[in-house]
Design a protein with these regions (language model features):
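Catalytic nucleophile-His microenvironment captured as a short glycine-rich beta-strand/loop
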Residues: 1, 76, 148-183
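Non-catalytic cell-wall polysaccharide-engagement segments
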Residues: 1-44
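Active-site-adjacent structural segments surrounding the nucleophilic cysteine of cysteine proteases
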Residues: 41-107, 185
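Noncatalytic regulatory segments and standalone regulatory/sensor domains
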Residues: 57, 170-213
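Extracytoplasmic/secreted cell-surface and envelope-processing proteins
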Residues: 109-116, 158-163, 186-188
Length: 213
C-alpha cells in the first residue's frame, strides 16, 4: 500500500459526515492509514513470482461442456480451482478434471458456479479446508504465509460480468500476483502486479483461502 493510496483513503474518509481529524485523532492520519494496510510478516516468504501455481486458461477448453456452454464460456470457477488443486496436491488436475467429478451439480444456470463448489471440490481432491472471507487484510496475510486464494469478482478490471481469479502471492511491497483464467496476450495479467485495495478488493464479492502446501 503506497503513501499516495493512503492519502487518497484519508481524504475520502474525512470527507464523510462526522468523520473528522479532531474527533478521531490520528485514525485518518496518513501514516496511520499506511501502517494499517502494511502486511504483518509472520515468517511468510515473498518469492519473486509468488507461489508456483500452474496457469490454466479456460479458453483452451471450449470443447468441454459446462453449465449452459463450455468451460471456455462458463468455467472460470473450476479452472481457478484446478490451478490451486494442481499446486497443492502435486498432481496434474486439469479444468476438465475439476468439472468431470461433479458435472453441473454446482452450476446455477444464468449465474455461474456456486460458491459452495470450492469446499466441495477441495474435499474431493484432497486439498484440505477452505476459509471464506471478505476481509482484504486477511487475504494479504494468507498470501504472505503461502496460502493460495480464489477471488470472486464483479464488473471491473477483470470482468464485465462475474469472474473468478486466483491470487498466487504478494510481493515485498504489498502488490498481489494474479492467475486469471481468462488472461490473454493482450492483457498479460500473469506478468502484472496489482494493488489489492483499488484493483482487486474494490470489485471483490468474496475470497476463498486454501490451506498452505
Amino acid at each position: 500500500y503506497t503513501k499516495e493510496n493512503a492519502i487518497a483513503y484519508s481524504d475520502m474518509m474525512c470527507a464523510r459526515p462526522n468523520w473528522h481529524y479532531d474527533r478521531y485523532g490520528d485514525k485518518e492520519y496518513v501514516e496511520h492509514v499506511l501502517r494499517y494496510y502494511q502486511i504483518t510478516n509472520t515468517g511468510g516468504s515473498y518469492p519473486a513470482n509468488g507461489m508456483q501455481i500452474p496457469h490454466y486458461l479456460q479458453t483452451d477448453y471450449g470443447n468441454i461442456p459446462y453449465g449452459g456452454g463450455s468451460i471456455a464460456s462458463s468455467g472460470c470457477g473450476p479452472t481457478s480451482f484446478a490451478m490451486i488443486a494442481s499446486y497443492l496436491t502435486g498432481n496434474t488436475i486439469t479444468p476438465p478434471d475439476a468439472v468431470a467429478w461433479c458435472g453441473n451439480s454446482y452450476y446455477k444456470p444464468g449465474v455461474g458456479t456456486y460458491w459452495s463448489y470450492f469446499q466441495a471440490a477441495a474435499s474431493h481432491f484432497g486439498c484440505g479446508s477452505v476459509t471464506q472471507t471478505s476481509n482484504a487484510n486477511t487475504v494479504l496475510q494468507a498470501l504472505s504465509e503461502g496460502r493460495p486464494v480464489i477471488s470472486s469478482q464483479r464488473p471491473g478490471l477483470f470482468t464485465s460480468g462475474g469472474h473468478f481469479i486466483v491470487l498466487r502471492g504478494v510481493t515485498a511491497n504489498g502488490k498481489v500476483l494474479v492467475n486469471d483464467p481468462n488472461d490473454s496476450d493482450a492483457k498479460n495479467y500473469i506478468n502484472r502486479e496489482f494493488d489489492m485495495m483499488s484493483e482487486i478488493h474494490a470489485t471483490a464479492n468474496a475470497y476463498w483461502i486454501f490451506d498452505k502446501k
